[in-house]
Design a protein with these regions (language model features):
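Hydrophobic transmembrane alpha-helices and their immediate loop junctions
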Residues: 1-168
Length: 168
C-alpha cells in the first residue's frame, strides 16, 4: 500500500522467519530506488533533460531518508536485525546510542519529524528488547551481518553519490 508523500507499507500473509528476510524486505525498496535514480541520472546525461536530474535527486533523497537508522524506517529495521543478531544487549546499546545521537541532532537542527520518528523508534526498540526471548526470528550469522552492513552502506553511498553528481 502506498500513501503519496508519506510512504508505503508492504503486507504479506507469510510470517518473517529470519532476520535475513527482514533485512532483504527492508532494503529492497531503497535498493530499487537506487537503480531508478541511476536510470534517471543516465537519462539526464544522455538527453540533458533537467527533469530527469530532478527525479534522480528527489528519488535519492526519499530513499536516503528511508534508510535513516531509525525504526520504523527501513534503515532502522536493517540496524535492528544486525544489532540484535550480534547480541541482544549490544543491540539494545547500539540502538539506544543511535537514538540518543538522533535526538541530539533533531534538537540541534530543529527537526521535529526526526524527533517524532526517534520517539516511535525508541519505543519499538524497547519492546523488541523485552520480546527478545519470545522472538522466533533466526539471527543473522556473521557472514549475513557483514553482507547486510555492506549492502546498506553501498546503497546509502550510491544514493549520496547521485545527489553529489547532479550537484556538480
Amino acid at each position: 500500500m502506498l500513501i503519496p508523500f508519506v510512504g508505503g507499507l508492504a503486507l504479506s500473509d507469510d510470517k518473517i522467519n529470519t532476520r535475513w528476510q527482514d533485512v532483504v524486505i527492508s532494503i529492497m525498496g531503497p535498493f530499487f530506488g537506487l537503480i531508478l535514480s541511476v536510470a534517471c541520472l543516465i537519462g539526464y546525461w544522455l538527453t540533458d533533460l533537467e527533469i530527469l536530474a530532478g527525479l534522480a535527486v528527489f528519488n535519492a533523497l526519499l530513499n536516503l531518508f528511508n534508510l535513516l537508522p531509525i525504526l520504523p524506517l527501513d534503515g532502522g529495521h536493517v540496524l535492528k536485525s544486525i544489532a540484535f543478531s550480534i547480541n541482544s544487549k549490544v543491540g539494545l546499546i547500539t540502538c539506544a546510542l543511535g537514538a540518543a545521537l538522533g535526538i541530539y541532532i533533531s534538537y540541534y537542527f530543529g527537526l521535529a519529524l526526526l524527533g517524532f520518528l526517534l520517539a516511535i523508534g525508541s519505543i519499538e526498540i524497547f519492546f523488541e528488547y523485552k520480546r527478545r526471548h519470545l522472538s522466533q526470528l533466526l539471527p543473522l550469522n556473521r557472514y549475513a551481518q557483514i553482507v547486510s552492513a555492506v549492502w546498506y552502506v553501498v546503497t546509502v553511498g550510491g544514493l549520496s553519490a547521485i545527489i553529489w553528481l547532479v550537484g556538480q
